Amino acid sequence: MQYKNLGARGPRVSTIGFGAWAIGGMNWGPTDDDVSKKALHAALDAGVTFFDTADVYGFGHSEDLIAEVIKERGKGDLIIATKAGNDFYHAGKESDSGYGAIQQNYKKKYLIEAAEKSLKRLGLETLDILQLHSPDLEKLEWDDPWEALTLLKEQGKIQHAGLSIQSFKESEQAHLLERHKGLLDCIQVRYNLLERKAEKLLFPEAIKYGVGVIVRIPMLFGLLSGKFNRQSIFEGDDHRRFNLDAEKLKSYLGKMESMSDLYERYPDFSPAQVALRFGISHPACSVSIPGGKTPAQVNENCAASDMPAIILHPPESGLDD
């Protein structure tokens, strides 16, 4: 396992992290808590030190599982990054889970309360990183979310402040970095072989301001692992029913076929490993957070850290306009 500093102010982290959305038990198909915990232990055994979760993943369940493993193995030098802003506590009609429909909530009071609830679930006195969870751009024009992060830092309840960036214009994303460069320590960015917009403007700005980059969706919801085809169907509450519908699958798979030469260069590595290694090869990027529901998936992911760097020019991949 290789390690990098998360920007100029962030902690040192493993270049392959553990994305804990799937183990929350919602939106990714069936999961088993015992297997999920084994996956977390496998990550620790492989040298993973960076674990990314969110309060909304499984309505707190992802954080609960991480807390159980921390109790068993100790916190040590682990970096736990969570997120807040998708309010499942107060909104709408209650479901069987006891929570209502999720709504964005970036009011100062709510974010502070959400951070305190995450601290309690995780069994920690301070959060290593708290990230605003993919807010719409208009929410980021408010003072509330930034005041909340500032206060939580001052109170010692969080060590570092981050932003998981939603899909809006690169120029607007870069402006946020400039505007909040003194507060933001890291950003989480959608970046993979088929989605490379961030290279144009956002990554240079992140380097300029010393803001660390966490690579999210590095395998495009599993598509870049090579295990899906045009006939793939996602069932039930699996979010990929919408994020990888038939039309998107066709488009993405067509782009993947044009990159066959890339995979042939690395015959000893899986498509998933090639995708992951690409994501952490850019100098702006410190850590990638693939999901892993089983120990086997985790071990495959972690092996990508020790691959040679994969640097591509725009014509060689799906650099989007």
Where are these regions (language model features)?
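Beta/alpha (TIM)-barrel catalytic core signal, keyed to glycine-rich beta->alpha loops juxtaposed to Asp/Glu
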Residues: 134-320
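Active-site mouth loops of central-metabolism enzymes
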Residues: 22-34, 96-109, 138
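Active-site groove signature of glycoside hydrolases
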Residues: 119-138
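Short, acidic/polar
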Residues: 30-43, 106-121, 168-177
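Conserved, mostly hydrophobic/aromatic
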Residues: 6, 18, 36, 51, ...
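A short, structured active-site edge motif that brings together acidic residues
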Residues: 77-89
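Acidic (Asp/Glu)-rich catalytic clusters
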Residues: 10, 69-75, 120-123, 153, ...
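N-terminal binding-site loop/beta-alpha segment at the start of enzyme catalytic domains
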Residues: 1-78
